[in-house]
Design a protein with these regions (language model features):
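Aromatic- and glycine-enriched pocket-lining scaffold segments that form the walls
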Residues: 150-239
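Low-complexity, Ser/Thr/Pro/Gly-enriched N-terminal "stalk/linker" regions
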Residues: 21-87, 116-117, 121-138, 174, ...
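Terminal, non-catalytic domain-edge segments
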Residues: 23-44, 171-172, 294, 300-456
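Hydrophobic core segments within long, regular secondary-structure runs in both alpha-
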Residues: 27-42, 96, 112-126, 159, ...
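Long, repeat-rich segments with strong aromatic
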Residues: 230-319, 327, 360
């Protein structure tokens, strides 16, 4: 039996009933499309030596990585924004969760090897820095040098992916214990820093805050968290560490954090999770703290699913179930944006990001770095309209589809499920410049593994 046949087997639980005249893609067509996406990701968007994930690469070549010297000099900026190594923790962590599901569904040596390769990249990102709790975004050509700024959007997917990997059955014994210890070391470092995501340079500040969330003092210049994202991510990490370590202290801290009201909030974190989040419509600016971008907040929907599956208390579970359903219904309206993508589009994508150094200036804090990167993005988008095009019509609909699928087969999102399948078969993966389409595998495998979640 071939790999594609194995992948297609059992997909029926994911497919919605469709009339004979429907043009909804069938099981085999979807499975073949996903296998094509998988092959393209491994061909172009994973570092062949270090296993880290690239943001973009030319269809026929490899990306231009920042040199170690450029990383040390903070070029193009300390956040690595607009470079090919901007989102290694973010994309790699979520991709590892999909590869872990892929292995559980088809326990082959090839699937194990693929997951191990991405996991090795995530381990490298956790060990690259010298600051406790720091997760690097990516590494330079030497496999070690990195930009100093991390973020919540890098850190939480790292935890989520490593949790999925450690629960997949791929790693056992001493190897598993070592990786659990690494996760706990990262969490301990964050806890000592009041759950703020530190920069790996003394005095540079932090970028992300799971306790303080958004306030007059915490703004987008310090990576302040929307309340929903901060609450769901913080709770997931605590409960996952309890499940992995068996240490009662993590469970006690989880229950304390779950029931307390953060800062001046009128609601507990559990109540914040139940409300979910109103995503900023794709193609429009985010409005923090209550309307974050759909794609950066999507991993918080995965946090809710993890909490639903790990939480022993039925009352708390019902809150997580409510949040999952609310987010899925809100995201469902954006899945059909895939229709705006034309596979024959030839708009420009500038892969040599070094033109951004013309706007470069020294940075002594995370605030300086955010201001510089915000200035650079205007020129980046002028030179690379194709990048914006793929964000609008590849990234956003696929992340929306993932949010829908993470909630399981729910009546409220039934109309979107046909659009999810059409999105998975719409793209010609080999013509894409960005790696956002890794999310197609997340969508597919979440649909297969979580479709049964029809009851609280």
């Amino acid at each position: 039996m071939g790999r594609r046949t194995v992948l297609a087997a059992g997909l029926g639980a994911f497919l919605p009933p469709a009339p004979a005249a429907s043009n909804t893609p069938g099981e085999r067509e979807v499975a073949q499309s996903i296998e094509g996406a998988h092959e393209e990701m491994f061909r172009r968007f994973l570092d062949p030596e270090y296993g880290t994930t690239y943001d973009y690469a030319p269809p026929g070549g490899t990306p231009l990585l920042p040199t170690p010297q450029e990383c040390r000099e903070l070029k193009p900026n300390a956040l690595a924004w607009w470079s090919p190594i901007e989102n290694g923790g973010f994309f790699g962590g979520l991709y590892l969760s999909a590869l872990s599901d892929r292995f559980r569904l088809a326990r082959s040596a090839a699937n194990e090897q693929g997951a191990r390769r991405v996991a090795s990249g995530l381990v490298r990102l956790a060990r690259a820095g010298g600051t406790p709790g720091f997760i690097a975004r990516g590494v330079s050509t030497d496999g070690l040098t990195h930009f100093p700024a991390s973020s919540s959007d890098q850190t939480f997917p790292w935890f989520y992916g490593m949790t999925a990997y450690l629960m997949s059955g791929i790693v056992k014994g001493n190897e598993k214990r070592e990786l659990v210890r690494l996760m706990e070391e990262v969490a301990d470092g964050l806890q000592r820093n009041a759950w703020r995501m530190p920069c790996d340079r003394a005095g540079f500040g932090h970028f992300g805050d799971w306790l303080g969330a958004f306030s007059d003092a915490n703004t987008t210049l310090t990576g302040a968290e929307p309340h929903f994202d901060a609450a769901s991510r913080l709770l997931f990490v605590h409960l996952a560490l309890y499940r992995l370590t068996g240490k009662r202290a993590w469970l006690d801290l989880y229950r304390q954090r779950r029931d307390e009201r953060p800062g001046e909030a009128a609601r507990s974190r559990l109540e914040i999770c139940a409300q979910g989040v109103e995503y900023a419509p794709p193609g429009t600016p985010a409005r923090y703290p209550d309307h974050p971008p759909l794609w950066t907040s999507a991993s918080s929907q995965a946090a809710l699913l993890g909490l639903l599956r790990m939480e022993p208390d039925p009352g708390a579970r019902s809150h997580y179930r409510k949040g999952l359903d609310a987010n899925a219904a809100r995201a469902a309206r954006y899945v059909d944006r895939y229709q705006g993508f034309n596979n024959l589009d030839q708009s420009a994508f500038e892969h040599d990001w070094r033109f951004l150094n013309e706007l470069w200036r020294p940075q002594s804090s995370i605030q300086d770095a955010v201001r510089l990167a915000t200035t650079q993005v205007r020129e980046w988008h002028k030179r690379s309209p194709r990048k914006v095009y793929e964000c609008d019509f590849v990234r956003d609909p696929l992340f929306a589809a993932w949010i829908v699928n993470l909630a399981g087969n729910r009546a409220s999102t039934a109309p979107a499920r046909s659009q999810v399948l059409k999105a998975l078969t719409h793209y010609r993966w080999s013509c894409l410049h960005t790696s956002h389409f890794f999310m197609a595998e997340c969508v597919y495998y979440s649909g297969r593994t979580h479709a049964h979640l029809s009851k609280p």
